[in-house]
Curated annotation (Swiss-Prot):
This chain binds calcium. It comes from the Eukaryota. This is Myosin light chain. The keyword Repeat applies. Myosin is a hexamer of 2 heavy chains and 4 light chains. GO terms for cellular component: myosin complex.
Length: 16
């Protein structure tokens, strides 16, 4: 994961 700021499902596709 790349973005662990908000939900792991929200930025899942962005911080893949």
């Amino acid at each position: 994961e790349g973005f662990q700021l908000m939900d792991r499902g929200t930025f899942d596709e962005i911080g893949r």
